[in-house]
Design a protein with these regions (language model features):
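Polybasic low-complexity intrinsically disordered regions
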Residues: 82-85, 95-288, 361, 367
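Basic, amphipathic alpha-helical segments enriched in Lys/Arg and hydrophobic/aromatic residues
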Residues: 279, 288, 316-377
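Short alpha-helix plus adjacent loop in nuclease-associated cores
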Residues: 112-116, 315-320
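Secondary-structure capping and boundary motifs in well-ordered enzyme cores
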Residues: 22, 26, 53-61, 72, ...
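Phosphate-backbone recognition surface of nucleic-acid-processing proteins
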Residues: 91-109, 292-294, 300-315
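Charged, often Cys/His-bearing segments associated with DNA-binding zinc-finger transcription factors
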Residues: 1-36, 177, 186, 190, ...
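Basic, low-complexity intrinsically disordered segments
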Residues: 2-11, 15, 27-137, 152
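Acidic, metal-coordinating catalytic cores used for nucleic-acid/nucleotide bond scission
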Residues: 53-57, 271-279, 298-300
């Protein structure tokens, strides 16, 4: 017999959201790991809020919602709240009952200064990695480092001269800069035809900490920041991260800072690509008791800072091979999580957002590793 469609929905539901989520759903493990770390952050959250006044949206719920945004690659906080309103899975993950109202998207804006700071996100990552079931997954000896460009939330049209003067008039029509106005007229805002832009002469008015940087010769320069990660080589988990201004030495300087912060008394190795093959960087690593497993840059006229005493060992080849896995971290963060184009301004805010996405990546990676262990057990 043909069934009839019910046009009027029921007024009540007697099935909880907990029962609707499959027991094998990966978000269950993600939420459990995130809740453990957030519970240990409770003393820090208490210091961020005054004792009196109206109750706020719990900071744990806001951070869980932002983790969802990264995991599912939701483009904006407004779309996140829209999906949080009708998606029972998202409501369950954040801790909202089916009848609870969702908060306004501007809640994230008003709490950004409070919750999205680098120290808090770094502590979140540290507490996640210190969980009892996560510690056995980490290597304390072998690591890899790399950096990636993050497109700043600022366009070329926001560039202005640092000295406050006007740029020279544009070239005449038909010459260099074909199609422009006649010579002698004032240059329109954002018109840089015939000019050589540099970080020494121009600065963005939208984000004065962003810097012009190009990935390779022949590629256009964009206002960017640079994200850095240190990955342990056993299972590809990120153990340290930060964001810096995009400069020629930023990758090596950040790598050295993060390498010094690695804990443990064991002798450590640090794998890196050819861009880190400089005598100064290699010497600094050795001074800090870290064996540099940097890919040899032998295609240039200068000699490599890594000689045969390091390159001859089998461990060096293993580190060079394992180092490539860090590209998967950046690929997920920029492509799947949507951080190729930043939606925050200022190095500190960008650093907090980047670290939050690193936490999201680690949560997914740890969940997959623990599930594989359960299958093999």
């Amino acid at each position: 017999m043909r069934g009839q469609q019910e046009r009027t929905g029921p007024l009540f539901s007697y099935i909880s959201t907990e029962e609707r989520i499959p027991a094998s759903h990966p978000l269950r493990q993600v939420r459990r790991l995130a809740d453990q770390a957030l519970d240990r952050l409770n003393p820090t959250f208490c210091k961020l809020y005054p004792e009196g006044g109206r109750p706020s949206i719990p900071p744990e719920q806001q951070l869980l919602a932002l983790l969802l945004q990264a995991i599912y690659g939701i483009r904006s906080e407004r779309m996140l709240i829209e999906q949080l309103d009708y998606n029972l899975l998202f409501r369950w993950f954040v801790g909202l009952n089916p009848d609870d109202p969702v908060w306004h998207p501007t809640t994230f804006t008003k709490n950004r200064d409070r919750l999205l700071n680098e120290e808090l996100m770094a502590k979140f990552l540290e507490l996640l990695l210190s969980a009892p079931e996560v510690k056995p997954l980490l290597s304390s000896e072998h690591f890899s480092v790399d950096g990636t460009l993050l497109r700043a939330w600022a366009s070329h049209s926001s560039l202005e001269r640092i000295d406050g003067l006007d740029d020279d008039p544009p070239p005449p029509s038909g010459g260099r800069g074909f199609g422009g106005s006649s010579s002698g007229t004032k240059r329109a805002k954002g018109d840089f035809r015939g000019l050589l832009l540099s970080n020494q002469t121009h600065r963005s008015t939208s984000d004065d900490e962003a810097r012009l940087f190009k990935k390779a010769p022949g590629v256009g320069a964009f206002l960017s920041f640079m994200g850095h990660c240190v990955m342990e080589n056993r299972n590809g988990l990120v153990v340290a991260s930060e964001v810096s201004q995009a400069t020629g030495k930023a990758e090596r300087d950040a790598a050295l800072r993060m390498a010094r912060s690695l804990r443990g008394a064991h002798q450590k190795t640090l794998g890196a690509d050819k861009g880190y093959d400089t005598r100064e960087f290699v010497a600094d690593l050795r001074i800090n008791g870290i064996t540099p497993h940097v890919a040899q840059n032998i295609q240039t006229r200068r000699s490599s800072a890594i000689d045969g005493r390091t390159a001859r060992h089998q461990g060096y080849a293993q580190s060079i091979n394992a180092r490539k896995r860090i590209e998967q971290v950046f690929g997920w963060i920029k492509q799947s999580a949507g951080l190729r184009q930043l939606k925050a301004r200022g190095r500190s805010k960008v650093g907090a957002v980047f670290r939050l996405h690193v936490v999201a990546y680690n949560l997914i990676r740890i969940t997959n590793l623990l599930r594989a262990q359960e299958v093999m057990a």
